[in-house]
């Protein structure tokens, strides 16, 4: 799988243009704030249906305009596939695959497989549990077709349960709570099992990568909401989650929120026996984040039997020569997009200069 060409119109600061890419390593260079990251963002948008920077869809429109449109031609097994994403202010976004409009962004997942590497990856390690849950949900959604559906159903039931907790406090009967709990357990257990299985694969990869890069040991500890060391048996997880919800009801009623479940989970990356978020140096944390993304790439490749497209947004300047060489070696044979301030110290198959939103192929 690779991106043959990209067309952008009114996307961020990028000028209206069509760009043709190489199958190998594509280097985009130029000064800061010229549009390098915006180019990668447009490709990632066609892959995931949202900005990797966390921006709202309306914020992707070029200043002074009222719409944007992005289109890519993807080559997959010698067949071309067209993906389009358009949005106009105060209207619904329009996403099409081969000319057919899709109903939700969830249908877009898997059409263009990408892995994004950026300096913000460090936040997965350094910040709070919500960052790691969000990252985990994003990764699993691409390789497990039912994961996003289960997550959406769970969140909907969770919201209704929290509303009910407040109503009970105000005098409503507790009897209906059991119905919500059964539904929450049903979807929650599926989420927990999928997370457990995914993190097992992550651990295998991270152990290998960290040992090869810096000769350090690593393990993943899944802090699941049911208190199990191995939460891969769905029936056992259901039973434990139901017990936890029942046991915690008084606390839930006190705070009007559900205190137990996948929405409160976390995972730790342990380096040399210590929690990397708390005890590792920034260099170790950066290496852990890099290994996490390389693991995402390996799992995506294995589970889909496809070649994902790699997007490296200004990460090479953050790596020493040893890590830079290791990353490029791992990504050999895959279409890769790399943004950098200069082309001098990177070897690529195609070079593009970006200035004021104009992409010039050399």
From Swiss-Prot:
Keyword Glycoprotein set for record: no
One GO term (biological process): DNA synthesis involved in DNA repair
Pfam families named in the record: SMC_N
Record-level Gene Ontology MF annotations: ATP binding; single-stranded DNA binding
Annotated compartments: Cytoplasm
GO cellular component, one term: cytoplasm
Family (UniProt): Belongs to the RecF family.
Protein name: DNA replication and repair protein RecF
Gene name per UniProt: recF
């Amino acid at each position: 799988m690779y991106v043959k060409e990209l067309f952008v119109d009114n996307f961020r600061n990028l000028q209206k243009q069509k760009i043709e890419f190489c199958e190998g390593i594509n280097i985009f260079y130029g000064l800061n704030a010229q549009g390098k990251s915006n180019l990668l963002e447009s490709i990632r948008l066609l892959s995931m249906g949202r900005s990797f920077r966390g921006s709202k869809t309306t914020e992707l429109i070029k200043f002074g305009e009222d719409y944007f449109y992005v289109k890519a031609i993807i080559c997959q097994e010698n067949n071309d596939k067209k993906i389009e994403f358009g949005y106009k202010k105060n209207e619904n976004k329009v996403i099409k695959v081969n000319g057919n409009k899709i109903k939700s962004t969830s249908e877009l997942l898997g059409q263009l497989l990408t892995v994004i590497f950026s300096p913000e990856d460090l936040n997965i390690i350094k910040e709070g549990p919500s960052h790691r849950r969000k990252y985990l949900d994003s990764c699993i959604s691409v390789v497990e077709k039912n994961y996003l559906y289960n997550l959406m159903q769970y969140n909907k039931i969770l919201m209704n349960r929290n509303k009910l907790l407040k109503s009970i406090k105000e005098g409503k009967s507790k009897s209906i709570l059991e119905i919500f709990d059964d539904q929450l357990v049903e979807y929650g257990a599926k989420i927990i099992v999928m997370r457990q299985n995914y993190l097992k694969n992550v651990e295998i990869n991270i152990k290998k990568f960290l040992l090869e890069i810096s000769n350090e040991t690593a393990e993943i500890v899944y802090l699941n909401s049911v208190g199990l060391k191995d939460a891969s048996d769905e029936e056992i997880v259901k039973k434990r989650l139901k017990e936890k919800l029942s046991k915690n009801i008084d606390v839930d009623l006190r705070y009007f929120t559900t205190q137990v479940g996948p929405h409160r989970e976390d995972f730790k990356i342990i380096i040399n026996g210590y929690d990397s978020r708390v005890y590792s140096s920034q260099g170790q944390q950066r290496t852990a984040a890099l290994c996490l993304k390389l693991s995402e790439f390996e799992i995506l490749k294995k589970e889909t039997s496809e070649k994902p497209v790699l997007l490296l947004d200004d990460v090479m300047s953050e790596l020493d020569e040893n890590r830079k060489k290791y990353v490029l070696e791992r990504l050999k044979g895959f279409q890769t997009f790399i943004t950098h301030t200069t082309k001098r110290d990177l070897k690529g198959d195609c070079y593009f200069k970006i200035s004021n939103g104009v992409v010039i192929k050399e």
